[in-house]
Amino acid sequence: MIAKGYTNIWVLDISANAIEKAKQRLGESASKIHWIVADVTDFEPPVQFDFWHDRAAFHFLTTEEKINKYVSIAEDAIKENGYLILGTFSENGPTKCSGLGVKQYSEHSMSAKFEVGFNRIKCVTEDHQTPFNTIQNFVFCSFKKK
């Protein structure tokens, strides 16, 4: 994204180690990014975003309290007519990841979680090949903020 001229990029991860690896991979370009180490359900964004992309964090939220908190944060943090892209394990995907339980979603169940504040654009379900040569079934949905 940086190479394409995007600015005001924020990256949030619960893992400081993951953030450090990403910074090292980006080299000098890492200084152009706002890096946040936090649990997304504790995140209080100081700005609103045009675009929010989450690939494989949402499915680690397994309680209704955490799920609802995430949805509320996304609704508040994304600008009107902004976009939300989510990728989670599908109902045919793994039930655990990195030793942790996950919540699986269908295109319908994920859309239902966000229907109050967002209009669904499109959902697709697809297989993802991991670096360990295993297959994981994901559902990806895109939404537009109402």
Located regions from the model:
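A conserved beta-strand element that flanks and buttresses the S-adenosyl-L-methionine
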Residues: 53
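Conserved acidic residues
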Residues: 50
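Short catalytic micro-motifs in class I SAM-dependent methyltransferases
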Residues: 56-60
